[in-house]
Amino acid sequence: MAKKKPVEKNGLVYKEFQKQVSNLKKAGLIPKTLDVRKVKPTKHYKGLVSKYKDVATGGAKLAAIPNPAVIETLEARGESIIKKGGKAYLKARQQINQRGQIVNPFTVRVTKRGEVVRRYRKTTPEGKPVYITQRELPIKFENMEQWLTELKAAGFQLQPGEQIYFTFNGNYSRRTYTSFDEAFNKFMTYDIIIDAVAGKLKVEDEADLVKSVGFQRISGPEAKAYNRNRIVLPEMQFSQAAKKKYKRRQKRGYGSKGV
């Protein structure tokens, strides 16, 4: 029996168009009361699908931001924010895996404090599922001591079968620790961090120094065997401007004391 051809209206495959509108509805960009089955490919809806193409096609996920006060902090961290109808949404960042493939979060949400929680589903070489949860903290760099205190207070409670490590990334180095206290103490041995706490860095340097900080946990029955050395928490990424500053310091005989 021959398959039915998809119904086309205004040059669009109608069913595919409805699916794209449905994705916008799930993301909160159009009213929840809308009956997608009755939507016609009008100029209005075609415009919305075109404007939010990556969301409509399922290539990007949105999360509602429940507290408008954290929008400025999220934008300063380089997050992509969509504002529509008096509401704000965070567009989830994509990851590139080792094969060069784009990986979208399994789920993404924003807490009232402004924490961004992303959950990814990956598999072991044997095909077993592993879940990776990333939680980025909305901590401004202006108060470094508070930043470090909140970072330490926001640690995860381990659940049965979970594996957790702490890694510091920055200044062209990466070190992984099994104890948060050990990682925290090593974190504080860097000259550039000590200068920040002591207020020796200029405001523009502070803004460039740290992009984000967060925790990452791996859970699932295969968590322990998944990858022992790639769980990173806290993760601190230095901007290009900060890296250049650090290189100049090294040439003058300064640098990090620890690593």
Curated annotation (Swiss-Prot):
The keyword Cell inner membrane does not apply. GO terms for biological process: DNA replication; viral DNA genome packaging; viral DNA genome replication. Heterodimer with viral polymerase. Binds to ssDNA. One of its GO terms (molecular function) is nucleotide binding. GO terms for cellular component: host cell nucleus; virion component. A motif (Nuclear localization signal) lies at residues 243-259. Its main location: virion. It is found in: Virion; Host nucleus. The gene is VIII. Keywords: Covalent protein-DNA linkage, DNA replication, DNA-binding, Early protein, Host nucleus, Nucleotide-binding, Phosphoprotein, Viral DNA replication, Virion. It comes from Enterobacteria phage PRD1. Belongs to the tectivirus DNA terminal protein family. It comes from the Viruses. The modification O-(5'-phospho-DNA)-tyrosine is found at Y190. Acts as a primer for viral genomic replication. DNA terminal protein is covalently linked to the 5'-ends of both strands of the genome through a phosphodiester bond between the beta-hydroxyl group of a tyrosine residue and the 5'-phosphate of the terminal deoxyadenylate. This protein is essential for DNA replication and is involved in the priming of DNA elongation. This is DNA terminal protein. The keyword Nucleotide-binding applies.
